[in-house]
Design a protein with these regions (language model features):
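Hydrophobic alpha-helical segments
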Residues: 1-239
């Protein structure tokens, strides 16, 4: 519907921010380019996004914030936001199942009482804001949320209501990379025959450093980033 600008055609500060994201994730999320046709709005959009999503409080974690996005975006039928933020939710909650459950039916998802109360209020703000009153907000205070936390719940719901509609307006589809993010731990690259021969020809210190580094990083992703749900290869294949 709308032409998507190329990286070469957008202002340098936008290009620099997009490069930072690509360096961290390995790809450029499509929404970054879809919205770049309006640079001033792009800057305001992502500044507001970061202010809401990159902070954390005792009662409202980064993972909770992403679940708000997934639940409200599902209610608003926004494919891009459900898939993209579902991927981030899997990583930030360290729970590969929860984002799919929340996207499909958050009311039946494996949530604790605090998370369920947060999503109940967030969805009300997103789809029927006229029903939100002091009694509704009081349910969040009962779960330890401060007034600032409650403001964030409302702001995230409102901000992504706009984001959902912009994604639909621009027909922005999720990147393929989002679908596997947070589902499987990162593993060392598989060396092909020619690469193995090159490795064997290297001096032994280089070979030792390489293999040791791959072993350490693989263990890190399995035990630190995804503890408990993928203890061994057999567990992944049987699930």
């Amino acid at each position: 519907m709308f032409d998507v600008p190329s990286l070469e055609d957008i202002p340098e500060d936008l290009r620099s921010r997009i490069k930072e994201v690509a360096d961290k994730s390995g790809f450029v999320p499509n929404i970054f380019l879809s919205l770049a046709r309006r640079p001033a709005e792009w800057r305001a959009f992502f500044a507001y996004h970061d202010a809401l999503m990159d902070k954390e409080t005792p009662a409202l974690s980064k993972g909770d914030r992403e679940l708000i996005v997934v639940a409200t975006s599902a209610e608003n039928h926004c494919l891009y936001c459900v898939v993209a933020h579902g991927a981030i939710a899997r990583i930030r909650t360290r729970n590969p199942r929860i984002a799919d459950q929340v996207a499909t039916d958050w009311r039946s998802a494996e949530l604790d009482g605090r998370q369920r109360a947060i999503l109940e209020v967030a969805v009300k703000i997103a789809v029927e804001p006229w029903t939100v009153n002091d009694e509704v907000l009081g349910s969040l205070r009962a779960h330890g949320l401060t007034d600032d936390d409650i403001w964030d719940v409302g702001s995230i719901s409102a901000f992504f209501a706009m984001s959902n509609r912009l994604a639909r307006l621009t027909s922005t589809m999720p990147n393929e990379e989002f679908y596997l993010m947070g589902r499987l731990p990162r593993t060392p690259p598989v060396l092909h025959a020619g690469q193995m021969e090159a490795m064997e020809a290297m001096p032994w210190p280089v070979t030792w450093v390489w293999t040791h580094w791959m072993r350490v990083t693989s263990r890190f992703w399995r035990t630190v980033c995804f503890p408990g749900w993928l203890p061994a290869a057999s567990s992944a294949s049987s699930s």
